[in-house]
């Protein structure tokens, strides 16, 4: 029970933080709870697809090769998880009347990502200990939130394109809302999967740079928030 609480706390704290950054018009609590729940549920299809893809990759490449590490982390994990998190946010919020400001998209995608991260964290911590909970609270959960920030920017552009009747631009930016966070996610997971001293140095530098960038980007987007227009 104690570890479960530790596992949930960082995700909930970050949801509250991103909610407070929405300065113009707060999002309905019911909508955010729905998005969070959809994010939690998106773990199910993600796990199934990850298992299937892993088996497919192992048919063609050995598990101890760099090729497998790249394929598994970028496609078998990052692409699948970001797609599931984006769909969770889209199903819950895309047609909702509250989705009327650009920063709303970041709030929605971060909330979905943290729903996913929360249940993933619980599963990992049930198999680990307090050290696992602390490490994931400092690294893995914020990384999911950052993926949500990246996703949310492109998600918002796609929504505005739809309002303008530009289907081609909408489609392109919805794809980017998955592809761009996939890059960050894939680099993060790949660095953790490789066994080399310089990789660990790179990983921690990468985490620091991305964390600082994401914080500044959220502040900037919050300060420049505006109503979505056709």
Kindly give the residue locations of the regions a language model identified.
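Hydrophobic alpha-helical segments at protein termini of multi-pass membrane proteins
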Residues: 1-230
């Amino acid at each position: 029970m104690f570890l479960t609480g530790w596992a949930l706390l960082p995700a909930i704290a970050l949801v509250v933080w991103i909610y407070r950054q929405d300065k113009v018009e707060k999002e309905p609590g019911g909508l955010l709870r729905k998005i969070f729940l959809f994010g939690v549920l998106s773990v199910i299809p993600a796990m199934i697809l990850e298992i299937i893809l892993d088996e497919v990759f192992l048919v063609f490449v050995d598990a101890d090769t760099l090729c497998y590490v790249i394929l598994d982390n970028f496609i078998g994990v990052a692409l699948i998880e970001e797609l599931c998190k984006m769909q969770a946010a889209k199903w819950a919020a895309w047609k909702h009347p509250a989705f009327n400001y650009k920063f709303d998209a970041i709030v929605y995608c971060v909330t979905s990502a943290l729903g996913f991260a929360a249940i993933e964290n619980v599963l990992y911590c049930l198999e680990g200990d307090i050290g696992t909970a602390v490490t994931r609270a400092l690294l893995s959960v914020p990384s999911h939130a950052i993926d949500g920030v990246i996703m949310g920017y492109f998600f918002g552009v796609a929504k505005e394109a739809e309002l303008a009747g530009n289907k081609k631009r909408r489609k392109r930016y919805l794809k980017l809302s998955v592809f761009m966070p996939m890059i960050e996610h894939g680099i993060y997971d790949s660095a953790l999967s490789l066994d080399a001293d310089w990789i660990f140095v790179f990983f921690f530098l990468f985490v620091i740079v991305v964390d600082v960038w994401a914080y500044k980007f959220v502040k900037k987007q919050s300060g420049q928030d505006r109503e979505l227009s056709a």
